[in-house]
Curated annotation (Swiss-Prot):
Record's keyword annotation contains Glycoprotein: no
A GO cellular component entry from the record: cytosol
Subunit structure: Monomer.
Protein name: GTPase Era
Compartmental location: Cytoplasm; Cell membrane
């Protein structure tokens, strides 16, 4: 008897900085979603593709749900809600080392009206005592009737295989949408821009993160298979530009070196990376700039 192929879509939702991008990167086995210890680093719905012989699951890593403070914030939250509307399962992710807060309760209330089954994923279990984990499970169990509660460590991989088995079982019968070796539906230049932005967040001060965008101006492969990437880092203030460039260009060079290493790993080729920094005042509040920098509602 032949087993029918399964396929479907899964949304990953939760408060900012609970490990959604880390989980997605583990699922696909490669870095496609930006990771940082600073909140609200995922801005577009990143689609990662998990493929095994009997199933294919498309994962959507949404921006962390928060109270918007500007147009970009509105976009990020709307993007998260759109992701939850038409999926076969929703993973509500919380962090074991953070107490349940108003933000979690807000998301839970929205999830109660969800059409798809909701799984509670308790991440970072490697950071808490087992007794504390039991009390967390008990607390969340009182808030909503979850399909299943699955404790994991996205960083260490604890319980990861069980999570994937559960999700494959949940998926309906369906075709394989993407080739076996495709791990995201985003073009390479998008992933490249995210890798550069990740390094900016990693290396600069707290005032930078939510004011930065990265635009890849060109990506060209030469006759020696070396990839030439030109990209512009967009900030809102001259002071931020100074921080990113650094004394004698030192910070920009560091950003470029670290980003280049990740881009070479992604493309499996040598990369020549050129970076510029440009000031575009208040870009997060201007629709035209949001579109120019890749935030388009019709795409995400």
């Amino acid at each position: 008897m032949t087993t029918e192929h399964k396929s479907g879509f899964v949304a990953i939702v939760g408060r900012p900085n609970v490990g959604k991008s880390t989980l997605l990167n583990r699922i696909v086995g490669q870095k496609i979603a930006i990771m940082s210890d600073k909140a609200q680093t995922t801005r577009n719905k990143i689609q990662g593709i998990y493929t095994i012989p009997e199933a294919q699951i498309v994962f959507i890593d949404t921006p962390g749900i928060h109270k918007p403070k500007h147009r970009l914030g509105d976009f990020m939250v709307e993007s998260a809600y759109n992701a939850m509307r038409e999926v076969d399962a929703t993973l509500f992710m919380v962090s074991a080392d953070q107490k349940r807060g108003k933000g979690d309760d807000f998301i839970i209330e929205r999830l109660k009206n969800n059409n798809s089954p909701v799984y509670l994923i308790i991440n970072k279990i490697d950071k808490v005592h087992p007794d504390d984990l039991l009390s967390i499970i008990e607390d969340y169990s009182k808030q909503m009737d979850f399909k299943e509660i699955i404790p994991i460590s996205a960083t260490e991989g604890n319980n990861f295989e069980h999570l994937m088995d559960v999700l494959v079982e949940q998926m309906p019968e369906g075709p394989q949408y993407f080739p076996d070796d495709q791990i995201t539906d985003h073009p390479e230049y998008f992933i490249v821009s995210e890798l550069i932005r990740e390094k900016v967040l990693l290396l600069t001060r707290d005032e930078i993160p939510h004011s930065v965008a990265v635009v890849v101006d060109s990506m060209k492969r030469d006759e020696n298979d070396k990839v030439h990437v030109q990209a512009t880092i967009i900030v809102e203030r001259d002071s931020q530009k100074g921080i990113i460039i650094g004394k004698g260009g030192k910070m920009l060079k560091q950003i470029g070196t670290k980003a280049r290493q990740d881009i070479e790993y992604l493309l499996d080729d040598k990369v020549y990376l050129e970076l510029w920094v440009k000031v575009q005042k208040d870009w997060r509040d201007k629709k035209i700039y949001l579109q120019d920098f890749g935030y388009r509602k019709e795409e995400y």
